[in-house]
Design a protein with these regions (language model features):
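Bacterial signal peptide processing site
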Residues: 19-21
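C-terminal motif of bacterial Sec signal peptides marking the signal peptidase cleavage site
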Residues: 15-17
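Hydrophobic face of amphipathic alpha-helices that form TPR/SEL1-like repeat modules
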Residues: 59-66, 70, 93-102, 116, ...
Length: 212
């Protein structure tokens, strides 16, 4: 009986080990397949971008800026985004603006960033609105203006950016419009994460102070 038990245990251990090995092999294959797809996408975008395709240049710049399907490379992000921006891509204008705004691969230049974000907005890129709002709220490269910040945040809020919504709520809170601030803080889209945590905290503070 003891001998049979030992044999069964050995079989189970062997099966478990084989299962783990198979899973590791599958994970490696899956990772390799994903990497191949990512490499192929970047390769295809690069080929199109070199031929002057504006959309490909824009996407390639974004890929290098945010590390999408490739490693972050701010030099290449700037190179391809500038090419696309020169051809009128509003998204690319915003992306070049982000590089200057954050100082990614270049020296921070708020005036240059402001111009690029403004051009991006004029071209219809909604993402640039958030940055313009931030610049006016904090007085980065422009004279601080909560009215102007609220103006841009209001427009950007329609895109569903919860960070923008929180920033807008803080401006209303500072202005004493607690009802509007509460309304904005409550719009968390049902999320409970690091992005919405400041909204819940601000909401709790207002309720605790009897300003809800």
């Amino acid at each position: 009986m003891k001998k049979k038990y030992i044999i069964v245990m050995l079989i189970l251990i062997l099966m478990f080990s084989c299962g783990k090995k198979k899973k590791r092999n599958n994970d490696v294959k899956s990772k390799t397949t994903i990497e191949q797809k990512e490499n192929n996408r970047i390769k295809e975008l690069t080929e199109k971008a070199r031929k002057g395709d504006v959309e490909a240049q824009t996407q390639l710049g974004e890929a290098y800026l945010h590390g999408i399907d490739t490693k972050i490379n701010y030099k290449k992000a700037m190179e391809w985004s500038k090419k696309a921006a020169a051809k009128g891509s509003s998204r690319a204008m915003t992306n070049v603006g982000i590089l200057y705004f954050e100082g990614f691969g270049v020296k921070k230049d708020y005036k240059q960033a402001y111009k690029l974000f403004s051009d991006g907005v004029d071209g219809g890129d909604m993402k640039a609105l958030k940055y313009l709002g931030t610049m006016y709220e904090k007085g980065l490269g422009v004279e601080k203006s909560f009215d102007s910040a609220a103006f841009y945040y209001e427009m950007a809020d329609s895109s569903g950016d919860l960070t923008v919504r929180y920033n807008l709520g803080k401006i209303y809170e500072m202005a004493g419009d607690y009802a509007k601030a509460v309304e904005l803080y409550q719009k968390t889209d049902g999320r409970m994460d690091q992005v919405t945590a400041p909204m819940y905290e601000a909401l709790g503070d207002l309720y605790a102070a009897g300003k809800g």
